[in-house]
Curated annotation (Swiss-Prot):
It comes from Deinococcus radiodurans (strain ATCC 13939 / DSM 20539 / JCM 16871 / CCUG 27074 / LMG 4051 / NBRC 15346 / NCIMB 9279 / VKM B-1422 / R1). The lineage of its organism: Bacteria, Thermotogati, Deinococcota, Deinococci, Deinococcales. This is Desiccation/radiation resistance protein DR_1769. Contains an N-terminal PQQ binding domain and a C-terminal disorganized low-complexity (LC) hydrophilic region. Residues 400-461 are annotated as: Disordered. Residues 1-33 form the signal peptide.
Amino acid sequence: MPDPAARRFSLPPFPLAALALSVALLGAPASLAQTAAPAPAPAQTPAAASRAAAPRVSWTKPLKVSSPVSIGPRGELTYVGNDSRVHRTDASGKELWSFALGDIGRAQPVLTPDGGVITAAYDDTVYALSPAGQLTWKAKLDGDVFASPALRPDGSVVVATAGGTVYALSSSGQTLWSYKVGAPVFSSPAVAADGTIYFGAQNGRLHALSPEGRLTWTYAARSSVFSSPALDAEGNLYFGSGDRSIYSLSPAGTLRWVQPTGLFVNASPIVTRAGLVVVGSYDGQLYALNTNGQVAWTYAAGAAIAAPAAELSDGSVVVGDLNGTLHAVTPTGQALWTLPGGAKIDTGAAVSDQGTLYFAVDGGNLNAVENLRPLATGPWPTFRASPLGWGRSATAAELTAQTQARQAAAAASTSQQPRLPTLAQAPAPTPAPAQTTPRPQPTPAQPATPAAPVPPVASPAPATARLTPQVIGGVIYLPLSPIAAGLGYQVQAGSPTRALLVAGSQRLTVPVRAVGGQSLIALRFVTGLPGVSVERQAGTLTLRREGLSAALPLDLAQLLPWAPQPEFPGVVRR
């Protein structure tokens, strides 16, 4: 969650006095000690862990972004700006329209199924806009709206205010019911599959309301709950607190476990496809916990984390810190890459189905990193569960639609995988520093059987080399020697994790992996080599460089077969 910046009251997410109190709290009380998870495993650090090549920032634009960014099905962006306007742009940041609000706002806009927008501002008002940016209705509430609204399946929205009231508004803006909390609410409501509404408040309690707005139960944490709850497939909920803890409650409100952290947890958790609860803390650590509360791994970002993380379809996780660095972490908690943002990052990264990642920094600049993976499909892979900002558990039909849309987008962008960063002239290889050695990926349950590699091409020729790809851990790999020879490179030296490609005066160090005595290179790295172009035809992907070419029999349906989505029966993913 971003820090609140309300104009009529100055309430930081955790006052300094409370911070001093939090630091003084050493450990959980006896009643919670038995539920605390084991001590974290040694944290992975950006300096110590293996890295892959960092992607390039495709563009940076001064778009005045203040809120989290919502992304529509076609890649269009919607956000609230620090100019007190709602903006919609295309995927490249070109403005399509804007609408003036009565004040600034930091709530994430909700994108309705018809392309409309529901958003809120610090003028105590919720606004509904048409797909063209025209006002449909607005509703005046009892306080500033910092928490992001939640969209229910019937089109109604649940909105919480700093005035301490939670409202349900109909699709036409009429108040269906309201519930008085008695304390400011900065935690964005989360709606479960059964319609139950969960949110935290500054009174230190996590509240559960029925779909009709009646209080079902509350759970008392030991400090304020600024963090927004995340839900897993079974309806269990996860949130952080100012008492330096991460909590899990059952749908009935009973404590499942609590995990202590070094400082307060204002960030909102996500739940990954593999069943990890991932959330950052002001202690500078990113925590990954199994849903039973055991620490799977921790990652040391080196700066406080207030933003929620996001999971990409390959299982990697991205998160920004308050020093302005965007971190990518492997599914096992190792550093993958980092990107400098230039200013603090306190909102989550937004990821389109087309594989473009957007992250905003303090001051309003928006950065785009293209040709990455799309968002993962799982119970709660990002803040508000969806790029649309719905803030609720998706139905089975919605999950199926999301999965198919992201698979189609991934298939369409196979030739546009992450590129290598700019590669300088490299000297003869020396023992690889940590940041250039990619972490070996998990062994897949059912890897495709590779065909025998084609013998290396003896000399550059216009003939097209034919290569057979294989899939490991959801990543398409090619035999290194044939693909290098087919594109005019010589493999002069290598190790199990890297290789030196030479073409004339050009010397490129690339990440590889050894499987069965053979060096393989990921397709996404090949397509990022300088001068390599890509052509796609039915069933074939052809790579070209300086008159040379290599053809790949790329049958995605065979390489990436549909598999049951374990969290959601009847849902498939590739």
